[in-house]
Amino acid sequence: MTFIPVNEPLLNGNEKKYLCECIDTGWISSEGPFVKEFEQKVSEASGRKYGIAVANGTAALEVAVQALGIREGDEVIMPTFTIISCAMAVTKVGAVPVLVDSDIHTWNMDVDEIEAKITPKTKAVMIVHLYGLPVETDNILALAKKYDLKVIEDAAEMHGQTYNGKPCGSFGDISTFSFYPNKHITTGEGGMVVTDNEELAERCRHLRNLCFKKDVRYVHDEISDNYRFTNLQAAVGLAQLERLDEFVKKKREMGRYYSNELRNIKGLILPIERTDYAENIYWVYGILLDRDIKSDNKTLQKLLAEEGIGSRTFFWCMHEQPVYQKQGMFAGETYPNAEYLARKGFYIPSGLALTQEQMEYVVCKVKKIMTQLY
């Protein structure tokens, strides 16, 4: 069997048709009509009034943080176990990420740790939903109300997911999405900020476009970046969005298959299928090695690659990132659950283009490897 990538998107809908329309009409830049349509449809799908498309998910977080007025010296509470984009969006403006550990069962941030981390400098909490299951959001919203904090919801991996029946992306002051190729819907690269606040939405649009002064071209009233999103990207995104329900269904079927086949393998801890508030949509199919196994996720990655199977290790913790350690940040901080996830967690091929034959091969080789390790 040829090499099985960890992710491959499904691009056999209207993507080519809409892209050809862009090329035929000449609308390929950020001014094209597909951009506004994509913004409208994503915001509607996420239960929001306004959508602002940007270059990628990292840009979406940066715009969200800046739009909320978070600045130097402010503190933002977030999980240590996440992608570095979350922390970078905060440190870029001179603010300070304040970290919490992970819930070992859901792999999301431990909500019970948040209140103890709130100080007079705390300005916001960043909710980060990971690997297909949402964070227990109600408790965070209650804390935000109690302490008058802003809430940023990173829903990058949550296209089509709900929390207690409400769409992920609909919570807090502002939410963000990513459209990287490993997401349920992709635009190649891309992201979006969604909100119900008209002033915040206008602020995000301003930040997206180099902060051009209103109605005066090439005059700028503050420093920003070019975070614009093209009509070509939006064309792909619209075609993808048309099939979101189908994609979520396929991901859940994939997750159930893997769980049924791997649940009795000694040494493996599999993702939770459902909680009281959500059913897993398996952004990726993550697996955790038992603590008794001496090997780490990098060993598994190497062994799977030898069998022609792509895989990825879990995120590395923010408090252990060299870039922050060099700056003296998070000195002496430890988060045992997150550290365990980062060292023992990995995910196997789970892209939308994955075939049944490929899944069966992956299962066979995972069983073989675990027999060798345990």
Say what each PLM segment does.
Residues F81, A95, S102, A156-E157, ...:
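Histidine-centered beta-alpha loop that forms part of the nucleotide-sugar donor binding/catalytic region
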Residues E153-T187, V216-D221, I269:
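Conserved active-site segment immediately N-terminal to the catalytic lysine
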Residues I28-E75, M88-V93, L99-D101, K166:
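Phosphate-binding glycine-rich loop
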Residues K36-K41, A45-K49, D112, A116, ...:
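PLP-dependent aminotransferase class I/II
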